[in-house]
């Protein structure tokens, strides 16, 4: 949000909403409507009159677990274009092929990643794993697979869940520590090595972690559509999967003084800050807006 305000090409007006929004007041003073996301989460239940405006509507794509219920809002909210950091193939696995979509990377607020602890001053012999994990107990997996076969937490975070069980991994849930939101880099700077793992698609952690100067072990598979984010194995990160993750961790832990880890971490930091910063994302969003008006 701050990056949109900083962008010289945009004159942004934030609209505070209640349960319903009268969109008629936007007529005549708005070129583009940008929606927080295409779901009821964080949005008004009704955008009254939005279809009468003849103003382009762009929406950030909601969490994939809400995609099925969000499809009906495409017509109801008259959405012209979608964006997020997902690959186009992943988006169209979830939504109809005629829904227009653009991949736009964002998530690194550059100022939050400045002056962090140097790589060699960080914890070496432990690996950080943070974020939600699933319940891997047999009965729980069966119940969750019946209720929500694909998008339950365990199926979305299989490798992350497995990593949390390793005795050399420090695991913390997202909201069970003091380093949430803008303070997350202050947790990351404690560790040389961290884990970014998601079953179906790379998420914001994949670039926040290297941006903080961490050697980032990234789950990267055909299943999770990860290649589009541009990181390279053994150059800007270390790729892992369910078959090799322990081997990759042991390679690092058995040789923590090897200078190549710092080199990969530094390369990853430079790549993440250059390609995933919020100002670049805002500029790409401005490009999309320009195309539609």
Where do the protein language model's features map onto the residues?
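A short acidic/histidine/glycine-rich donor-binding loop in glycosyltransferase catalytic cores
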Residues: 233-240
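C-terminal "capping" alpha-helix adjacent to the active site of nucleotide-linked donor transferases
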Residues: 241-260
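CheY-like receiver
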Residues: 24-26, 187, 248-252, 288
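Nucleotide-sugar donor-binding catalytic core of glycosyltransferases
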Residues: 1-49, 53-208, 215-229, 279
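A charged, aromatic-enriched C-terminal amphipathic alpha-helix characteristic of glycosyltransferases
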Residues: 258-290
């Amino acid at each position: 949000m701050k990056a949109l305000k900083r962008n010289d090409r945009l004159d942004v007006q934030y609209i505070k909403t209640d349960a319903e929004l009268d969109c008629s007041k936007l007529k005549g003073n708005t070129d583009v409507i940008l929606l927080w996301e295409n779901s009821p989460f964080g949005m008004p239940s009704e955008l009254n009159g939005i279809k009468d405006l003849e103003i382009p509507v762009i929406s950030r794509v909601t969490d994939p677990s809400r995609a099925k219920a969000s499809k009906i809002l495409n017509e109801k909210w008259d959405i012209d274009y979608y964006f997020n950091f997902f690959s186009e193939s992943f988006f169209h696995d979830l939504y109809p092929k005629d829904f227009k979509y653009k991949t736009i990377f964002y998530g690194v607020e550059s100022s939050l990643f400045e002056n962090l602890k140097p790589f060699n001053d960080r914890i070496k012999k432990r690996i950080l794993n943070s974020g939600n994990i699933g319940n891997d107990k047999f009965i729980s997996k069966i119940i969750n697979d019946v209720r929500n076969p694909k998008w339950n937490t365990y199926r979305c975070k299989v490798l992350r869940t497995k990593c949390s069980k390793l005795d050399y991994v420090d695991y913390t849930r997202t909201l069970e520590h003091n380093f949430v939101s803008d303070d997350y880099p202050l947790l990351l700077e404690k560790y040389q090595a961290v884990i970014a793992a998601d079953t179906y698609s790379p998420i914001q952690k994949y670039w926040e972690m290297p941006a903080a100067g961490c050697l980032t072990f990234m789950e990267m598979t055909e299943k999770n559509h990860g290649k589009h984010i541009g990181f390279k194995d053994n150059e800007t990160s270390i790729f892992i999967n369910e078959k090799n993750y322990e081997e990759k961790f042991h390679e690092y832990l058995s040789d923590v003084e090897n200078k190549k880890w710092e080199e990969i971490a530094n390369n990853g930091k430079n790549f993440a800050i250059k390609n995933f910063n919020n100002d670049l994302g805002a500029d790409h969003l401005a490009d999309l807006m320009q195309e539609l008006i």
